[in-house]
């Protein structure tokens, strides 16, 4: 399951999936949400709203991707590069949006990308 969920990993809408915060808690048929730990424990998010980081852009994994055989989850990260951020002004430190109202800002998105690394 992946997308802009419009909620953080620990919000009620996401908790209905039953996804676990830690890999060791995942049983057969469960989901694992690595972004929960990324936001809550590491303080890293994908969008900044009123000075607070949120992590709406999530990739939730099935237990099959945590097995020892075949393609499996290795790690995740929020893709953070200097050019993705507003460099000055009121919104300094926020992701550099494409536009703000009618003003073209020549940015990328108001959200940072998320990446899941898989290995054989």
Positions of predicted regions on the chain:
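Active-site flanking residues adjacent to catalytic metal/cofactor-binding acidic residues
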Residues: 2-4
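Metal-dependent phosphoester-hydrolase catalytic domains
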Residues: 6-120
